[in-house]
UniProtKB/Swiss-Prot annotation:
Binding site for siroheme: C490
GO cellular component: sulfite reductase complex (NADPH)
Name assigned to this protein: Sulfite reductase [NADPH] hemoprotein beta-component 2
Keywords on record: 4Fe-4S, Amino-acid biosynthesis, Cysteine biosynthesis, Heme, Iron, Iron-sulfur, Metal-binding, NADP, Oxidoreductase
The keyword Disulfide bond is assigned to this record: no
InterPro entries: CysI (IPR011786), NiRdtase/SiRdtase_haem-b_fer (IPR005117), Nit/Sulf_reduc_fer-like_dom_sf (IPR036136), NO2/SO3_Rdtase_4Fe4S_dom (IPR006067), NO2/SO3_Rdtase_4Fe4S_prot (IPR045169), NO2/SO3_Rdtase_4Fe4S_sf (IPR045854), NO2/SO3_Rdtase_FeS/sirohaem_BS (IPR006066)
EC numbers for this chain: 1.8.1.2
Superkingdom in the source lineage: Bacteria
Pfam families tied to this protein: NIR_SIR, NIR_SIR_ferr
Cofactor binding, per record: Binds 1 siroheme per subunit. Binds 1 [4Fe-4S] cluster per subunit.
Source species: Pectobacterium carotovorum subsp. carotovorum (strain PC1)
Native organism taxonomy: Bacteria, Pseudomonadati, Pseudomonadota, Gammaproteobacteria, Enterobacterales
């Protein structure tokens, strides 16, 4: 695709990419503010899916059309269309919900989805898999009835806003969480399409306007976090816009703003690369929404609409320069950034088990492998959480590590909730640190982009890694391990110490050199290798780490220090070196 750049005398970098717009831009332009013909399509009983532009437009309403890839070939032989069903992702800024909401969510999963499960995602919300077309409208109405929605959790908008799950510092977490909600609400689309289609609200005569997102919305997906150091559980460097909380005597006073992180790449396309976020500066809290809006509108106007593979904020920053982007944000917000305030990250993992907060309430973080809540043989996780929800008076909090926190438990209720959790397999004291720090995306059988297994592959693979670590005497340690089924990066393998990126069925690219804090991108070490080859490499490397590491040296740092792999310093230029 030929692209030409428009240069500005004020900003010497190329600000806007001119050329033929992508078909996604046509679709958004013609969609009548995201309505399309979704309402009519819902009444078409001849197909289980959505047709034409509606296939993509439903993403703005929080859904993806999928099918069961395990039976796709079989259905094709029978001359049947794929078994279409929708993934629906809830908007849940900061991951906080009430037990009453959870019980309704649980009931719908059991009664109205193919798989019967609730999947906690690493974007701190939950999603349903396997919603048939006849249940699409009811799920939106169910969410609305409990004060939730699925608006803007997919496609070219600001997605679900993450917030550090930090129940110990309850007051600071609450302040950060309130800002996550405010940012989410401020950046929502203003179109009435969602309410008209799903809630049967009457169309009004007024003209739709999108003062922030614009009539063609953003060039690409946009992700935002609110981060409370020293925890980087939200993996800020995977996100377009990040607000790092700066506190004074336990009170939130402002944010460091970082822009332009992102992990997605395309195999074989060296114009795509992961990127860590760049520091723009510090702002006091009263400027938060103005800065959020200015970053979004700058990306709206300057982002590449001619090539979706280069449309994210990270590519805009590389094209126009961080300083130019910063100046534009300042001009639009009417705010000058101050110097970045000191901050430090020490880890990303959740504190599994019971912790006591400064408010004297107790908080139980449950490890949910792969975030998949279902009644397994001997481990009825879904039933257990429902039983806890019936008696718990605090919050349920979903984490960006796909776990769940029973938050705000008074001392008198602690023993009862602990007993229920153990009875239903929600607490397992034998779970290793390695398993707690391993993560995978969904991948097969529902994800249409999957190239290799991830969620179904991870549990047994971790067992093999655990065995290797035990053999080398480091069984109590952990390595941040992530598996993603394709290079789009949902499993965040590009911020792992060991990252596996799906290349084909049974084959992965092996990346090394990230760190525990999530501030360094790993480099590809071996390409397109199978599980046996991966385990052989891991065995050898863990042996070296166990023998030659320095005190408290993480595996990723060890691989860099000993020149096993070179660090990625400037991914736009050296990721593929």
């Amino acid at each position: 695709m030929s692209e030409k750049y428009v240069f500005s005398e004020k900003h010497p970098g190329p600000l806007v990419v001119e050329g033929k717009l992508t078909d996604a831009e046509r679709m958004k332009t013609e969609s009548n503010f995201l309505r399309g013909t979704i309402a009519e399509d819902l009444n078409d009983g001849l197909t289980g899916g959505f047709k034409g532009d509606n296939f993509l437009l439903i993403r703005f309403h929080g859904m993806y059309q999928q099918d069961d890839r395990d039976i796709r070939a079989e259905r094709a032989e029978q001359k049947l269309e794929p078994r279409h069903a929708m993934l629906l992702r809830c908007r849940l800024p900061g991951g906080v919900m009430t037990p009453e909401q959870w019980l309704r969510i649980d009931k719908f999963a059991g009664e109205s989805t193919i798989y019967g499960s609730i999947r906690i995602t690493n974007r701190q919300t939950f999603q349903y898999h396997g919603i048939l077309k006849s249940n699409v409208k009811p799920v939106h109405q169910m969410l609305n009835s409990i004060g939730l929605d699925a608006l803007a959790t997919a496609n070219d908008m600001n997605r679900n806003v993450l917030c550090t799950s930090n129940p110990i510092e309850s007051e600071l977490h609450q302040q950060a969480y309130e800002w996550a909600k405010k940012i989410s609400e401020h950046l929502l689309p203003r179109t009435r399409a969602y309410a008209e289609i799903w809630m049967d609200q009457e169309k009004v005569a007024t003209t739709d306007e999108e003062p922030i997102l614009g009539s063609t919305y953003l060039p690409r997906k946009f992700k935002t976090t609110v981060v409370v150091p020293p925890q980087n559980d939200v993996d800020l460097h995977a996100n377009d816009l990040n607000f790092i909380a700066i506190a004074d005597n336990g009170r939130l006073v402002g944010f460091n703003v970082l822009v332009g992180g992102g992990l997605s790449i395309a195999h074989g396309d060296k114009a795509t690369y992961p990127r860590t976020a760049s520091e723009l500066g510090y702002i006091s809290i009263e400027h938060t929404l103005a800065i959020a809006e200015a970053v979004v509108t700058t990306q709206r106007d300057w982002g590449n609409r001619t090539n979706r593979k280069n449309a994210k904020t990270k590519y805009t920053l590389e094209r126009v320069g961080v300083d130019n982007f910063k100046q534009e944000v300042e001009a639009r917000a009417g705010v000058k950034f101050e110097a970045v305030r000191p901050y430090e990250f020490t880890g990303r993992g959740d504190r599994i088990g019971w912790v006591k907060g400064i408010d004297n309430k107790w908080h139980l973080t449950l490890f949910i492998e792969n975030g998949r809540i279902l009644d397994y043989p001997g481990r009825p996780l879904k039933t257990g959480l429902a039983e806890i929800a019936k008696i718990h008076k605090g919050d349920f909090r979903l984490t960006a590590n796909q776990n769940l926190i029973i938050a705000g438990v008074p001392a008198r209720s602690k023993a009862k909730i602990d007993a229920l959790a153990r009875e239903h397999g929600l607490i397992d004291d034998s779970v290793s640190e390695q398993r707690k720090n391993s993560m995978a995306c969904v991948s097969f059988p529902t994800c249409p982009l999957a190239m290799a297994e991830a969620e179904r592959f991870l549990p047994e693979f971790v067992t093999k890694v655990e065995d290797i670590m035990q053999q080398h005497g480091v069984g109590d340690e952990h390595i941040v391990l992530r598996v993603t089924g394709c290079p789009n990066g949902c499993g965040r393998a590009m911020l792992a110490e060991i990252g596996l990126v799906g290349k084909a069925v049974g084959r992965y690219n092996l990346h090394l050199g990230g760190n525990r804090e999530g501030t360094r991108i790993p480099r590809m070490y071996r390409e397109n290798i199978n599980e046996t080859e991966i385990l052989a490499e891991i065995d050898r490397l863990i042996g070296l780490w166990a023998q030659d590491r320095q005190p408290n040296e993480g595996f990723g740092d060890f691989t860099i220090r000993t020149n096993i792999i070179r660090p990625v310093l400037d991914p736009a230029r050296d990721f593929y070196d």
